[in-house]
């Protein structure tokens, strides 16, 4: 599929779709509240990726707690009930850091015609900074998250005036 859009325009379109799609995922509303908006997952580290032919697959990210100072980490897991297609590249044994993670409606891909896109199918695109990047396509996405102790403590502090 040919496009006259620049890479930046494609990224911005993907970001808009992510902003609309992510909050609709099961379990995402509380994470959106924590981040006071849809998280971009900028500088998040991919800590775990489980791909299964049958049953659930998942990706786990370690993301900064949403404050101006280093107040701990939030661990986000996106479960994929039915994995349809995978296109990944660049795994690094030391660290896998992403610029962004976007969830958006799945698009047809003539180059990778291994599946037929159905309504409700979603793509998870990993925009790599270092290491793993690529695309996961699936159905039945669900979001879960936890915080480390520092982030839990930070979440109990009253917000500072002017911030």
Task: Enumerate the language-model features and the residues they cover.
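Surface-exposed, interaction-prone regions used to assemble/regulate multi-protein complexes
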Residues: 1-163
């Amino acid at each position: 599929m040919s496009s006259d859009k620049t890479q930046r325009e494609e990224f911005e379109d993907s970001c808009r779709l992510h902003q609309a799609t992510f909050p609709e995922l099961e379990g995402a509303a509380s994470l959106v509240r924590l981040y006071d908006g849809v998280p971009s997952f900028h500088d998040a580290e991919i800590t775990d990726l489980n791909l299964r032919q049958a049953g659930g697959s998942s990706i786990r990210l370690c993301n900064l707690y949403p404050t101006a100072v280093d107040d701990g980490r939030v661990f986000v897991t996106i479960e994929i009930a039915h994995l349809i297609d995978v296109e990944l590249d660049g795994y690094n044994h030391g660290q896998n850091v992403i610029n962004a993670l976007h969830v958006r409606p799945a698009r047809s891909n003539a180059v990778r015609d291994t599946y037929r896109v159905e309504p409700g199918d979603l793509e998870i695109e990993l925009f790599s900074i270092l290491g793993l990047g690529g695309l996961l396509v699936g159905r039945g996405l669900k979001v879960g998250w936890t915080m480390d102790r520092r982030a839990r403590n930070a979440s109990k502090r009253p917000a500072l005036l002017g911030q």
